[in-house]
């Protein structure tokens, strides 16, 4: 089966001042030849004078073959197919937005191309027709090329009825929903923060326990917080959630509460690692650490302080 391809958006060429994602194909005397990834790899050129605001000492330090770059369109000749681009005119904020749009548009593209492969389409025109009847409908409806289709597909995970207005056969609709669910169903992430909590005053360990319990009370039904002792005075806080941003916020809130409580008792609070999403590798290493410490402390008085503290929720 031939590899199918199609542009991401309904319009065949970008507009002047659009920020687009390109892949560098070759470097010549006049500049760099690139492929516009969102426009079915049509060719464009970044002129040498548009690579950097500073004096160019080494082109290879500014741009490399095979690398993706965010660039802005400065001229389009649709008849001749010429597209002039600039790297130096792209602000950091524009680059971030470009990367976000490209990632979401590429996800939509991957879903629809896989649908086409499952349905055994053999021509690019068939894939383009699928785009016209799905992604581009939502892009046009919401006036947000790239984002419109992505947001609609995300919504379809919980409410497939959003696809009812599309001109699709029963089989096309079924395969599309299957692929949307596989690619866009939210995946739970684990968020972790490392903190130091200690109190060398009269209340000592009781003050630490009270502060940690106050942090645990920031748990919600959907985001339970756990706190484990790594080695005094260091603790690891974790939560598992479908909402990354909310998870980070909940851990930050819990840390603020712990800090306030322990400092009321003239204790010490330090952040060793800010809240972040952790990988399976991070979790495996943490489990090994905890297991080793448990063995080392097995015969030490006060072992109960090393037990996992977990939010208790009412049944």
From Swiss-Prot:
Superkingdom is Eukaryota
Does the keyword Cytoplasm feature in the UniProt annotation?
yes
Where is this protein primarily located? cytoplasm
SUPFAM superfamilies per UniProt: eIF-2-alpha, C-terminal domain, eIF2alpha middle domain-like, Nucleic acid-binding proteins
Q: Which SMART domains match?
A: S1
Q: Which is one Pfam family of this protein?
A: EIF_2_alpha
Where does this polypeptide localize?
Cytoplasm, Stress granule; Cytoplasm, Cytosol
Q: How is its activity regulated?
A: Activity is regulated by phosphorylation at Ser-49 and Ser-52, which stabilizes the eIF2/GDP/eIF2B complex and prevents the eIF2B-mediated exchange of GDP for GTP, thereby preventing the formation of the 43S pre-initiation complex (43S PIC). This results in the global attenuation of 5' cap-dependent protein synthesis and concomitant translation of ISR-specific mRNAs that contain a short upstream open reading frame (uORF) in their 5' UTR.
What are its GO biological-process terms? Answer: cellular response to amino acid starvation; cellular response to UV; negative regulation of translational initiation in response to stress; PERK-mediated unfolded protein response; response to endoplasmic reticulum stress; translational initiation
Tell me which residues bear Phosphoserine.
49, 52
Domain spans labelled S1 motif: 17-88
The family note in this entry says: Belongs to the eIF-2-alpha family.
Supply the name of the protein.
Eukaryotic translation initiation factor 2 subunit 1
User: What organism is recorded for this protein?
Assistant: Gallus gallus (Chicken)
Q: What's the name of its gene?
A: EIF2S1
